[in-house]
UniProtKB/Swiss-Prot annotation:
Keywords from the named record: Chromatin regulator, Developmental protein, Differentiation, Metal-binding, Transcription, Transcription regulation, Zinc, Zinc-finger
Coiled coil: none
Encoding gene, per UniProt annotation: EMF2A
Protein known as: Polycomb group protein EMF2A
Known tissue expression: Widely expressed. Highly expressed in shoot apical meristem and inflorescence meristem. Expressed in roots, leaves and immature seeds.
Zinc finger (C2H2-type): 338-359
BP GO terms, sorted: cell differentiation; chromatin organization
Location of the region described as Disordered in the Swiss-Prot/TrEMBL record: 420-445
Biased amino acid composition, Acidic residues: 432-445
Length: 624
C-alpha cells in the first residue's frame, strides 16, 4: 500500500467537500471507528499497522495467483462490458450541401463495406483482394429530409487496439452502382430482402458484380485524427469531413463467390471520369451516454492549455483516489486499478464489484464528484478489535476459559421396587432395628449441629436446622425416583445405530450423538458404490477399502494423505498382492492423488516398496 501523506488530516474525508449525494448507510462508514471505546482509539501509525495485516494476506494470494490464477480476469462480466463500451461507433453520411454537383447525378444506392485486405501483393491493374465483415447501404443525403438509409453505422475496436495493432489495413470501401434504373430506390440493404445487415447471402453478392465507382477511407486516416482528439475520451461526438476520390472500376464476380471477398479491376472499366465525394465521418465511444452521465466527466477543462488537454484528460479518466481512514494516508491508481492486487477493472463500477467481492476485510464507500473518483477504505470493526486485543495481550498471559458439560452426580439409590412402602408390625424386631438406626442418625446430626454452633457462634435452634435438613433430604429422595421412573417408562434409541438403549446407557455420562457405527457406515458406503454403473467390481472394492480406512483412522486434512497411503499399503498389503486387479486399482488411485497434488512421487515410491517388501517376505521361505 504505497500511501501518500496528506497535507491536512481532514483531507481524508474529501467526500464531504463536494455536493455529492450519499445515503445514511454510506455516511455511517466514516464514523465506524467511533464505536470503539476511548482506550481503543489508536494513533495513525498503529492504524496503519493494522491495515498492513490484511494487505499481507492479499499480497500472498496475489503472488500465488500469478502462477496459478483462480480465474481469467478477462472473463469477468464487468470487464467485458467495459471493453464493449470503449469500442468506437463510426457513422458515415453524405452531406447534401457539400455535394451539390452530385445531387443531379444518380450515385445511389451507395454501399459502404468495412473490409480488410487479405493480401498485400499488388497485381497490375487490380486492387488488393478485400474481405468485408460489415455492410451498410446509403440511399439519400442526410440533409435531404429522407432519414431512411441516410447514415451507415459501424462498430469497430477501441482506439487503443487500433493504435497497438495499426489496424492491419482496415478500410471503409464505398461502392456506387447508381443507374437510372435504380433511381429512387430506398430501404434496401446490400443483400436486399434476402439477408440481414450482418449476414450476407452468397447468391445476392453476385448482383454487385460489374461496372461501378469505388473509393476507400483507410482506418489509419481516422486514427490520426482520433488519437489527438480529447473529445472522444470525454464522450463527445467527433465529426470529420473527408473527401474521397471515387474511381471507376469493374467488380470481379469470381471473388464475390468466395467468402465475402471483392476486388476491383481498372482495365475493364470504361472511360469514365472519377469524381470527388464529400463524406462526413462521426466517431463516438459506444458507452458515451454513460460517460456523460457521470459527474466526474462534467469537469470543466477551460483553464487547461490546449497543448496539455489531451494528456491531462487521459491521465484523469481512470484515476481513483483511495483514502485510508484514520491513517492520514491516501493513494491514486490509474486505469481503475485495484490498489491491493493491481487488477485493472475497466471502469468504476467494475472496481466496486471487484473490491467488495475479493477484498472483504475492509469496508468501502464509493463516491464520485466533479473532481474525484474516490473510495474511502475502512478496516472492519471485528478485524480491528481482534488485532487490537492481540497486540495488547500476550498469548502466554491470557486466561483460558473452559466450560465442561454438566456432569451428573452418581448417587447410589435403591431401586424403585424397594422404595415402596413397607408395613411392619408393632413390636417386631424390624421396627426396633429401624428405631435404633433413626436414633443413632439423629444423635449424629445433633452432634454436627452443636459443633457448628460452637465454631460459628450461631444462635439458631436445633429444630430449625433439623427442619431444613429433613426437608432437603425428603425432596431429594422424592424427586430422583420419580425421574428414574419416567426414564424407565420411555424407550430411547441411539441416534446413529437406531438400536434401543439400555437403562444403564441412558443414565451414563457418555454421549452417543457423535458415535459412528462402523458396520452401518460400511453398509451405507457399499450401497453408495453399488449405484456406480461405469466402475468395475475391483474398483468398487478398492474405493470401499479406502473409505473405510480413512474413516476409522480419522483422515481429515490433505496433509494426512501421504502417511495414510503408507499405512494403507502396510495394512492391506497382503490383500492387494493376492488380487492383481486390486493392486493396479490401488496404484491408479495413487496416481489420481498425485494429479491433484495430494501425494508426492516419493510417497508413491515408498508405498510400492512396502508392497515389494511384503511380496519378498511371502516368497522367501527362510523368513517364513
Amino acid at each position: 500500500m504505497p500511501g501518500l501523506p496528506l497535507t491536512d488530516h481532514d483531507a481524508v474525508n474529501t467526500g464531504c467537500e463536494f455536493d455529492c449525494q450519499r445515503s445514511s448507510d454510506q455516511m455511517c462508514c466514516e464514523h465506524s471507528v467511533a464505536q470503539f471505546s476511548s482506550d481503543q482509539q489508536l494513533n495513525p501509525e498503529e492504524n496503519l499497522a493494522l491495515y498492513c495485516k490484511p494487505l499481507e494476506l492479499y499480497n500472498f494470494i496475489r503472488h500465488r495467483a500469478i502462477e496459478n490464477p483462480p480465474y481469467l480476469q478477462r472473463c469477468l462480466l464487468y470487464k467485458i462490458r467495459a471493453k464493449q463500451k470503449k469500442r468506437i461507433q463510426i457513422t458515415i453520411s453524405l452531406p447534401g450541401s457539400n455535394n451539390k454537383e452530385l445531387q443531379a447525378q444518380n450515385i445511389f444506392p451507395l454501399y459502404v463495406l468495412f473490409a480488410r485486405p487479405t493480401s498485400n501483393v499488388p497485381i497490375e491493374g487490380h486492387s488488393p483482394i478485400y474481405r468485408f465483415s460489415q455492410a451498410r447501404l446509403l440511399t439519400s443525403f442526410n440533409d435531404s429530409g429522407n432519414n431512411d438509409r441516410a447514415e451507415a453505422t459501424f462498430v469497430i475496436p477501441d482506439l487503443e487496439t487500433l493504435i497497438a495493432t495499426q489496424a492491419y489495413g482496415l478500410t471503409f470501401i464505398l461502392v456506387s452502382r447508381g443507374t437510372k434504373k435504380n433511381k429512387g430506390r430506398t430501404g434496401q440493404n446490400l443483400c436486399e430482402n434476402d439477408c440481414s445487415e450482418k449476414h450476407v447471402d452468397y447468391s445476392s453478392l453476385r448482383k454487385l458484380a460489374g461496372k461501378c465507382f469505388w473509393g476507400k477511407i483507410p482506418i489509419t486516416l481516422l486514427n490520426s485524427s482520433l488519437e489527438t482528439c480529447a473529445d472522444l475520451i470525454l464522450g463527445h461526438i467527433v465529426e470529420s469531413p473527408i473527401s474521397i476520390c471515387m474511381s471507376p472500376g469493374y467488380l470481379e464476380p469470381t471473388f464475390l463467390e468466395h467468402d465475402n471477398c471483392l476486388s476491383f479491376c481498372s482495365r475493364k472499366a470504361d472511360a469514365m471520369v472519377p469524381y470527388q465525394l464529400q463524406v462526413k465521418v462521426s466517431a463516438a465511444e459506444a458507452g458515451a451516454k454513460d460517460i456523460l452521465k457521470s459527474p466526474y466527466n462534467s469537469f470543466s477543462y477551460s483553464d487547461v492549455p490546449p497543448s496539455l488537454l489531451l494528456r491531462i484528460v487521459r491521465l484523469r479518466v481512470g484515476n481513483v483516489l483511495f483514502n485510508y481512514k484514520n491513517t492520514q494516508m491516501s493513494e491514486v491508481t490509474e486505469d481503475f486499478t485495484c490498489p491491493f492486487c493491481l487488477v485493472r477493472c475497466g471502469n468504476f463500477k467494475g472496481l466496486e464489484c471487484h473490491m467488495t467481492s475479493s477484498h472483504d476485510l475492509f469496508h468501502y464507500e464509493f463516491w464520485i464528484s466533479e473532481d474525484y473518483q474516490a473510495v474511502n477504505v475502512t478496516l472492519k470493526k471485528d478485524n480491528m478489535r481482534t488485532e487490537f486485543v492481540a497486540a495488547e495481550v500476550d498469548n502466554s498471559h491470557r486466561i483460558f476459559y473452559y466450560r465442561s458439560r454438566f456432569k451428573k452426580s452418581r448417587t447410589e439409590i435403591l431401586p424403585v421396587a424397594r422404595a415402596d412402602a413397607h408395613i411392619m408390625e408393632s413390636g417386631s424386631p424390624e421396627e426396633t432395628q429401624a428405631e435404633s438406626e433413626d436414633d443413632v442418625q439423629e444423635e449424629n446430626e445433633n452432634a454436627l449441629i452443636d459443633d457448628s454452633k460452637k465454631l460459628h457462634g450461631s444462635n439458631h435452634s436445633q429444630s430449625e436446622f433439623l427442619a431444613f435438613g429433613k426437608s432437603r433430604k425428603l425432596s431429594a429422595n422424592r424427586a430422583d425416583p420419580r425421574n428414574r421412573l419416567l426414564l424407565q417408562k420411555r424407550q430411547f434409541i441411539h441416534s446413529h445405530k437406531a438400536q434401543p438403549m439400555t437403562f444403564e446407557e441412558v443414565l451414563s455420562d457418555n454421549d452417543s450423538e457423535d458415535e459412528v457405527d462402523d458396520d452401518i457406515a460400511d453398509l451405507e458406503d457399499r450401497r453408495m458404490l453399488d449405484d456406480f454403473v461405469d466402475v468395475t467390481k475391483d474398483e468398487k472394492r478398492i474405493m470401499h477399502m479406502w473409505n473405510s480406512f480413512i474413516r476409522k483412522q480419522s483422515i481429515l486434512a490433505d496433509s494426512h494423505v501421504p502417511w495414510a497411503c503408507e499405512a494403507f499399503s502396510r495394512h492391506h498389503g497382503e490383500e492387494l498382492l493376492e488380487n492383481s486387479a486390486l493392486l493396479w486399482g490401488w496404484r491408479m488411485f495413487m496416481i489420481k492423488l498425485w494429479n491433484h497434488s495430494l501425494l508426492s512421487a516419493r510417497t508413491m515410491d515408498t508405498c510400492n516398496r512396502i508392497l515389494d517388501d511384503i511380496k519378498n517376505e511371502r516368497s522367501d521361505p527362510k523368513k517364513q
